Protein backbone atom coordinates (compact mmCIF):
# COMPACT_ATOMS: atom_id res chain seq x y z
CA UNK A 1 0.00 0.00 0.00
CA UNK A 2 1.24 3.44 -0.91
CA UNK A 3 0.84 4.82 2.59
CA UNK A 4 3.30 2.24 3.93
CA UNK A 5 6.13 2.95 1.47
CA UNK A 6 8.85 5.55 1.62
CA UNK A 7 10.25 6.95 -1.59
CA UNK A 8 13.52 5.20 -0.79
CA UNK A 9 11.78 1.83 -0.52
CA UNK A 10 9.96 2.36 -3.81
CA UNK A 11 13.19 3.26 -5.61
CA UNK A 12 14.99 0.27 -4.07
CA UNK A 13 12.25 -2.12 -5.22
CA UNK A 14 12.26 -0.58 -8.70
CA UNK A 15 16.05 -0.77 -9.00
CA UNK A 16 16.13 -4.38 -7.75
CA UNK A 17 13.45 -5.37 -10.27
CA UNK A 18 15.35 -3.68 -13.10
CA UNK A 19 18.61 -5.35 -12.12
CA UNK A 20 17.05 -8.82 -11.90
CA UNK A 21 14.46 -8.49 -14.71
CA UNK A 22 11.47 -8.86 -12.37
CA UNK A 23 8.04 -7.35 -12.05
CA UNK A 24 6.69 -5.83 -8.84
CA UNK A 25 3.24 -5.13 -7.47
CA UNK A 26 1.45 -3.06 -4.89
CA UNK A 27 -2.19 -2.66 -3.89
CA UNK A 28 -3.15 0.93 -4.58
CA UNK A 29 -6.05 3.35 -4.87
CA UNK A 30 -8.36 0.79 -3.36
CA UNK A 31 -10.04 3.12 -0.87
CA UNK A 32 -10.85 6.79 -0.55
CA UNK A 33 -9.13 6.68 2.85
CA UNK A 34 -5.84 5.71 1.19
CA UNK A 35 -6.10 8.48 -1.40
CA UNK A 36 -7.02 11.07 1.27
CA UNK A 37 -4.12 9.93 3.48
CA UNK A 38 -1.60 10.26 0.66
CA UNK A 39 -2.84 13.73 -0.28
CA UNK A 40 -2.79 14.85 3.37
CA UNK A 41 0.69 13.53 4.20
CA UNK A 42 2.48 13.64 0.85
CA UNK A 43 0.54 16.21 -1.16
CA UNK A 44 0.10 13.63 -3.92
CA UNK A 45 -2.35 10.92 -4.86
CA UNK A 46 -0.91 7.37 -4.78
CA UNK A 47 -0.06 7.01 -8.49
CA UNK A 48 1.43 10.52 -8.52
CA UNK A 49 3.56 9.54 -5.51
CA UNK A 50 4.75 6.44 -7.35
CA UNK A 51 5.59 8.53 -10.42
CA UNK A 52 7.59 10.97 -8.29
CA UNK A 53 9.71 8.05 -7.09
CA UNK A 54 10.13 6.40 -10.54
CA UNK A 55 8.03 3.40 -9.52
CA UNK A 56 5.78 3.27 -12.61
CA UNK A 57 6.55 1.37 -15.80
CA UNK A 58 5.97 -1.91 -17.64
CA UNK A 59 7.27 -3.93 -14.66
CA UNK A 60 4.80 -2.28 -12.26
CA UNK A 61 1.56 -4.11 -11.46
CA UNK A 62 -0.96 -1.84 -9.74
CA UNK A 63 -3.60 -3.94 -8.01
CA UNK A 64 -7.11 -2.45 -7.77
CA UNK A 65 -6.92 1.21 -8.96
CA UNK A 66 -10.57 1.73 -8.01
CA UNK A 67 -10.13 5.40 -7.13
CA UNK A 68 -7.72 6.71 -9.77
CA UNK A 69 -8.40 10.10 -11.31
CA UNK A 70 -7.75 11.29 -14.87
CA UNK A 71 -4.17 12.39 -14.09
CA UNK A 72 -3.35 9.02 -12.53
CA UNK A 73 -4.94 7.17 -15.44
CA UNK A 74 -2.74 9.16 -17.82
CA UNK A 75 0.39 8.36 -15.76
CA UNK A 76 -0.41 4.64 -15.74
CA UNK A 77 -1.04 4.66 -19.48
CA UNK A 78 2.01 6.71 -20.49
CA UNK A 79 4.28 4.54 -18.34
CA UNK A 80 2.79 1.32 -19.80
CA UNK A 81 2.04 0.13 -16.28
CA UNK A 82 -0.15 -2.91 -15.65
CA UNK A 83 -3.43 -2.74 -13.74
CA UNK A 84 -4.47 -5.96 -12.02
CA UNK A 85 -8.26 -5.82 -11.86
CA UNK A 86 -9.98 -7.96 -9.24
CA UNK A 87 -13.64 -7.83 -10.32
CA UNK A 88 -14.87 -9.96 -7.42
CA UNK A 89 -13.28 -7.68 -4.84
CA UNK A 90 -14.43 -4.58 -6.73
CA UNK A 91 -17.98 -5.90 -6.72
CA UNK A 92 -17.73 -6.79 -3.04
CA UNK A 93 -16.58 -3.26 -2.23
CA UNK A 94 -19.06 -1.62 -4.59
CA UNK A 95 -16.43 0.33 -6.50
CA UNK A 96 -15.15 -0.70 -9.91
CA UNK A 97 -11.96 0.74 -11.40
CA UNK A 98 -12.26 2.78 -14.60
CA UNK A 99 -11.07 -0.09 -16.81
CA UNK A 100 -12.24 1.44 -20.12
CA UNK A 101 -10.33 4.65 -19.42
CA UNK A 102 -7.24 2.78 -18.20
CA UNK A 103 -7.26 0.57 -21.29
CA UNK A 104 -7.77 3.56 -23.59
CA UNK A 105 -4.87 5.39 -21.90
CA UNK A 106 -2.50 2.51 -22.71
CA UNK A 107 -2.34 0.56 -19.45
CA UNK A 108 -2.29 -3.23 -19.75
CA UNK A 109 -5.21 -4.83 -17.92
CA UNK A 110 -4.73 -8.17 -16.17
CA UNK A 111 -7.28 -10.06 -14.10
CA UNK A 112 -6.81 -11.17 -10.51
CA UNK A 113 -8.78 -12.74 -7.71
CA UNK A 114 -7.65 -11.12 -4.43
CA UNK A 115 -9.55 -13.67 -2.32
CA UNK A 116 -13.22 -13.20 -3.24
CA UNK A 117 -13.25 -15.97 -5.79
CA UNK A 118 -10.61 -18.18 -7.32
CA UNK A 119 -12.94 -19.36 -10.08
CA UNK A 120 -11.58 -17.79 -13.26
CA UNK A 121 -14.94 -18.02 -15.05
CA UNK A 122 -16.59 -16.04 -12.25
CA UNK A 123 -13.78 -13.47 -12.45
CA UNK A 124 -14.30 -13.16 -16.20
CA UNK A 125 -18.08 -12.85 -15.93
CA UNK A 126 -17.99 -10.29 -13.11
CA UNK A 127 -15.30 -8.34 -14.98
CA UNK A 128 -17.44 -8.25 -18.10
CA UNK A 129 -20.60 -7.21 -16.28
CA UNK A 130 -19.01 -4.56 -14.06
CA UNK A 131 -17.14 -2.96 -16.97
CA UNK A 132 -20.33 -2.81 -19.02
CA UNK A 133 -22.14 -1.23 -16.08
CA UNK A 134 -19.42 1.36 -15.65
CA UNK A 135 -19.44 2.25 -19.35
CA UNK A 136 -23.19 2.94 -19.28
CA UNK A 137 -23.16 2.91 -23.08
CA UNK A 138 -26.16 4.15 -25.08
CA UNK A 139 -26.11 0.78 -26.86
CA UNK A 140 -25.62 -1.60 -23.95
CA UNK A 141 -23.68 -4.81 -24.23
CA UNK A 142 -21.33 -3.91 -27.06
CA UNK A 143 -18.17 -3.28 -25.06
CA UNK A 144 -16.34 -5.04 -23.76
CA UNK A 145 -16.93 -8.27 -25.60
CA UNK A 146 -16.15 -11.56 -23.83
CA UNK A 147 -13.06 -11.83 -26.03
CA UNK A 148 -11.74 -8.55 -24.59
CA UNK A 149 -12.05 -9.78 -21.01
CA UNK A 150 -10.57 -13.14 -21.97
CA UNK A 151 -7.56 -11.32 -23.44
CA UNK A 152 -7.15 -9.38 -20.18
CA UNK A 153 -7.08 -12.71 -18.36
CA UNK A 154 -4.68 -14.46 -20.76
CA UNK A 155 -2.37 -12.05 -22.59
CA UNK A 156 -2.80 -9.34 -19.94
CA UNK A 157 -1.82 -11.84 -17.27
CA UNK A 158 1.13 -13.08 -19.30
CA UNK A 159 2.28 -9.48 -19.78
CA UNK A 160 1.94 -8.85 -16.05
CA UNK A 161 4.28 -11.73 -15.23
CA UNK A 162 6.65 -10.78 -18.05
CA UNK A 163 5.94 -13.93 -20.08
CA UNK A 164 3.97 -12.54 -23.05
CA UNK A 165 6.55 -13.82 -25.54
CA UNK A 166 6.04 -17.42 -24.41
CA UNK A 167 2.43 -17.67 -23.11
CA UNK A 168 -0.85 -15.77 -23.11
CA UNK A 169 -2.01 -16.23 -26.71
CA UNK A 170 -2.25 -19.01 -29.26
CA UNK A 171 0.74 -18.49 -31.53
CA UNK A 172 3.30 -20.76 -33.13
CA UNK A 173 6.11 -21.38 -30.67
CA UNK A 174 4.18 -20.36 -27.55
CA UNK A 175 3.26 -22.75 -24.76
CA UNK A 176 -0.44 -23.28 -24.14
CA UNK A 177 -2.82 -25.17 -21.92
CA UNK A 178 -6.10 -25.69 -23.71
CA UNK A 179 -9.60 -26.32 -22.42
CA UNK A 180 -12.84 -26.85 -24.29
CA UNK A 181 -15.78 -24.84 -23.02
CA UNK A 182 -19.34 -25.68 -23.98
CA UNK A 183 -20.75 -22.16 -24.13
CA UNK A 184 -24.23 -23.56 -24.69
CA UNK A 185 -24.41 -24.39 -20.98
CA UNK A 186 -26.46 -21.71 -19.27
CA UNK A 187 -23.88 -20.97 -16.57
CA UNK A 188 -21.16 -20.30 -19.18
CA UNK A 189 -23.03 -18.03 -21.59
CA UNK A 190 -21.26 -14.66 -21.58
Regions found by a protein language model. Give the residues of each.
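Residue-level marker of alpha-helix boundaries and capping positions
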Residues: 3-4, 63, 89-90, 144-145, ...
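His/Asp/Glu-enriched, well-ordered alpha-helical/loop segment
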Residues: 52-59, 100-185
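Histidine/acidic residue-rich metal-binding segments in metalloenzymes
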Residues: 1-82, 93-109, 165
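Short, acidic/turn-prone active-site loops that include or flank metal/cofactor-
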Residues: 30, 87-92, 114-116
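Nucleotide-sugar donor-binding loop of glycosyltransferases
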Residues: 28, 87, 182-184
